[in-house]
UniProtKB/Swiss-Prot annotation:
The keyword Transferase does not apply. ADP binds at G39, G91, T92, T93, S94, T158, K159, A411, D496. GO terms for molecular function: ATP binding; ATP hydrolysis activity; ATP-dependent protein folding chaperone; unfolded protein binding. The modification N6-acetyllysine is found at K5, K199, K287, K365, K377, K388. The gene is CCT6. There is a cross-link at K251 (Glycyl lysine isopeptide (Lys-Gly) (interchain with G-Cter in SUMO2)). This is T-complex protein 1 subunit zeta. It comes from Pongo abelii (Sumatran orangutan). Component of the chaperonin-containing T-complex (TRiC), a hexadecamer composed of two identical back-to-back stacked rings enclosing a protein folding chamber. Each ring is made up of eight different subunits: TCP1/CCT1, CCT2, CCT3, CCT4, CCT5, CCT6A/CCT6, CCT7, CCT8. Interacts with PACRG.
Length: 531
């Protein structure tokens, strides 16, 4: 009888073989759910929430976040996989598949009496060799637009259908290249992802500027201005209460009038400063003038600005204020005390677009914008969500490639070559730990196997062909998902991120090792025993 039982009769305990069986079945269960998602030919999953909302996705990260996973071990694996996505932006499904397969291969040896500790030693030896092999096969190259397009396409085609992936690929790469600065980390927050329920998903485009999800608040303001000066400010153009708690008292109607006039004059002086600046920079030309304010603008001020032909937008979102100055230039002002023309930004075109009851303001044709907008279009909500998730992963894949300065061949090529390298390395490992290395090598082959299976080909036949081709040619050969034949991934331009593969090897080995070394599961916590 378990020691914990004597202390706590209500505790539930699973020991030795039973504990291992529970853990391995959980890992395999999760693997079976995500197995069909892998790769460009993977199938979709439909998630229906309690409220009846539908989400169509084949992104492993979205699935693991949205699914309600009850089993503690499966939940642990799901958290590791989603952490992989948070760090690198890809590899979630591969993570779950490899952990499941490592446990499955280990189970074969454990059922024959091998101790889990020996297998885990083999796993560690295999991981060291695999990481060393990854260093050898990585391709260091200049990250030009063409290479980045290949990287983005490889990532995006696993999330959305090929035609849409090709449209998104160029937009994603161009947006990163627009905001990239020499010797500085890439800040993906400088790429605004704006949704518009309109037209079809292939109309998604890159706007070299900014799109704001609101319009001007005055009916007489221009809907379109060209060659416009942009004044970005965070100054109240409406009467506001004082920040400290204060009161004003008047004895007569005349005094009240004076108070109202003083309040009004305070705002009017600010508006006059804007109008004077506009006259100074525009003169009699047709140039436009746009004021974008984070705080409010009252109807009187809007009226005065409108009469001068100034387009004014109020209550702009805070996150857009930084992007505005990066896209258009200029300075975001907190006071109008010393307004000067060199504080203004510039945009070639500013126009308002009305879609149903929603209004959008486009600020385009900026000179060298350091902040851009990806405008996602789609006919319905779940298409927009799916594209948004795909774009986020695509952006991170491109950023990773630039940060790493290298890529590795995809389509299962690295895994096949790595498995062969591990089998050659096996004799140099002492004793029974060799079996752990063998299990690790076999587990890695799950990736090319599942890629072939999801494309409708015989997985054993495809794998044998690829291994034979790799042995003969010595090149990194992957699966051609259209024909099921071997292909040299590097020649076709199928590239994966180096940091994703590296993280994958680390996290899968650690979690599989920890799960294998669990020999007792105790359900004896306070909360689990209530009732």
């Amino acid at each position: 009888m378990a020691a914990v039982k004597t202390l706590n009769p209500k505790a539930e305990v699973a020991r030795a073989q039973a504990a291992l069986a529970v853990n391995i079945s959980a890992a395999r269960g999760l693997q079976d759910v995500l197995r069909t998602n892998l790769g460009p030919k993977g199938t979709m999953k439909m998630l229906v929430s309690g409220a009846g909302d539908i989400k169509l996705t084949k992104d492993g990260n979205v699935l693991l976040h949205e699914m309600q996973i009850q089993h503690p071990t499966a939940s642990l694996i799901a958290k590791v996989a989603t952490a992989q996505d948070d760090i690198t932006g890809d590899g979630t499904t591969s993570n779950v598949l490899i952990i499941g397969e490592l446990l499955k291969q280990a189970d074969l040896y454990i059922s024959e009496g091998l101790h889990p500790r020996i297998i885990t030693e083999g796993f560690e030896a295999a991981k060291e060799k695999a990481l060393q092999f990854l260093e050898e096969v990585k391709v260091s190259r200049e990250m030009d637009r063409e290479t980045l397009i290949d990287v983005a396409r490889t990532s995006l085609r696993t999330k959305v259908h090929a035609e849409l992936a090709d449209v998104l690929t160029e937009a994603v790469v161009d947006s990163i290249l627009a905001i990239k600065k020499q010797d500085e980390p890439i800040d993906l927050f400088m790429i605004e992802i704006m949704e518009m329920k309109h037209k079809s998903e292939t109309d998604t485009s890159l706007i070299r500027g900014l799109v704001l999800d609101h319009g001007a608040r005055h009916p007489d303001m221009k809907k379109r201005v060209e060659d416009a000066y942009i004044l970005t400010c965070n100054v109240s153009l409406e009467y506001e209460k004082t920040e400290v708690n204060s009161g004003f008292f008047y004895k007569s109607a005349e005094e009240r009038e004076k108070l109202v006039k003083a309040e009004r004059k305070f705002i009017e002086d600010r508006v006059k400063k804007i109008i004077e600046l506009k006259r100074k920079v525009c003169g009699d030309s047709d140039k436009g003038f746009v004021v974008i304010n984070q705080k409010g603008i009252d109807p009187f001020s809007l009226d005065a600005l409108s009469k001068e032909g100034i387009v004014a937008l109020r209550r702009a979102k805070r996150r857009n204020m930084e992007r505005l100055t990066l896209a258009c230039g200029g300075v975001a002002l907190n006071s109008f005390d010393d307004l000067s023309p060199d504080q203004l930004g510039h945009a070639g075109l500013v126009y308002e677009y009305t879609l149903g009851e929603e209004k959008f303001t486009f600020i385009e044709k900026c000179n060298n914008p350091r902040s851009v907008t990806l405008l996602i279009k789609g006919p319905n909500k779940h298409t927009l969500t799916q594209i948004k998730d795909a774009v986020r992963d695509g952006l991170r894949a491109v950023r990773n490639a630039i940060d790493d300065g290298c890529v590795v061949p995809g389509a299962g090529a690295v895994e096949v070559a790595m498995a062969e390298a591990l089998i050659k390395h096996k004799p140099s490992v002492k004793g029974r730990a060799q079996l752990g290395v063998q299990a690790f090598a076999d587990a890695l082959l799950i990736i090319p196997k599942v890629l072939a299976q999801n494309s409708g080909f015989d997985l054993q036949e495809t794998l044998v062909k690829i291994q034979a081709e790799h042995s003969e040619s010595g090149q990194l050969v992957g699966v051609d998902l259209n024909t099921g034949e071997p292909m040299v991934a590097a020649e076709v331009g199928v590239w994966d991120n180096y940091c994703v593969k590296k993280q994958l090897l680390h996290s899968c080995t650690v979690i599989a090792t920890n799960i294998l070394l669990v020999d007792e599961i105790m359900r004896a916590g306070m909360s689990s025993l209530k009732g």
